Amino acid sequence: MKKLWIALLMAVCLVGCREDEVVVPTEYDVIPEEVKPGQKCIGMYLLNEGNMGSNKCTLDFVDFVQGYYVRNLYAERNPQVVKELGDVGNDIQIYGSRIYAVINCSNKIEVLDARTARRIGQIDVPNVRYVRFHKGYAYATSYVGPVQLNNPNAVQGAVYKIDTLSLKTVARCTVGYQPEELCVLGQYIYVANSGGYMAPNYDKTVSVIEIEGFKQVEKIPVAINLHHIKADAYGKLWVTSRGDYQGVHSKLLVLDKKMGRNEMQVTDTLDIPCSDFCISGDSLYYISTEWNNYSQSNAITYGIVNVRTKQKVSDHFITDGSEKEITVPYGIAIHPETHDIYVTDAKNYVSSGVLHCYNQYGIQKWSVRTGDIPAHLCFLMRK
């Protein structure tokens, strides 16, 4: 693939700004993309996690208008930031005109201009995991305590309420242990609690926070070691359980309202392992890399579930056989207009990964090298 290097002068200037660090300059790869007339989606950001402790979280950008994949964008746009993005990128979202990049082990949410990727500021949140938004506020899950595996005395997690104008925390609500993804639905925030630091005594609940009073009003028993939670168009919540990596397998669960009441409960359990998923229309696209401690290996699967019928309709969405090129499927997203499918490959977790693009029929369009552990994607829309 044709590669265009940014001007040598820029690289020299960047290195000059970091006396003790060598900064990898931004790279541009040509990709076969174009924006059709009337199309609102003009780009996609990809946050590369970077292996824990390596301080190698990076930001890439897919430019649908110009047909470029832009690698390591943050360092070029923000040469004054000494340690760049930081350690372990765990989530990325766009709200209004800003990017919110969650940098887990750097205990912060980095706030950038969505058009330029230039730094606006940061929000300090300890061991922060995911962020969502509602009426001018950001809500971020936090483990609260330090990174400490196998800690039976780990503290309960929390959701931080942040004013998106001042970038200041205005309130905090205690939830379950090691909370992961959260979802705003109606007047409530639903939080998937994992208890990941407390294995084998995992948490098994979804916390329910009333937005107006910002208090936890309920804990719904669901399954152990929860991770992702998303709502479909019918008001149901889809939740993933990672299991215990041994005898209890990963699965996908459905929460819906109790008959005649506002409370949610588990209505369906699908024995489908799921590491990550996204919902497009009535279709839930999932990927699974299920680790087993006994076999010391991953079981890799893909598929589609109809969210209306709650039935699996396919055990694959890549139809041309090119999934064999993927070593570790790690992240997934669906283009909101073209319905192209994006799957990231973490490879060996310590070197560059790959982003694969497939059309809506599952035929590969292109692949491109990314940063280390490509994981989280969000789309940039026209103003």
Model region roles, listed by residue range:
Residues 13-16:
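C-terminal motif of bacterial Sec signal peptides marking the signal peptidase cleavage site
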Residues 1-4:
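Positively charged n-region of N-terminal signal peptides that target proteins for export
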Residues 18-383:
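Predominantly soluble domains enriched in secretory-pathway, periplasmic, or organellar proteins
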Residues 9-10:
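Hydrophobic alpha-helical targeting segments used for export or membrane insertion
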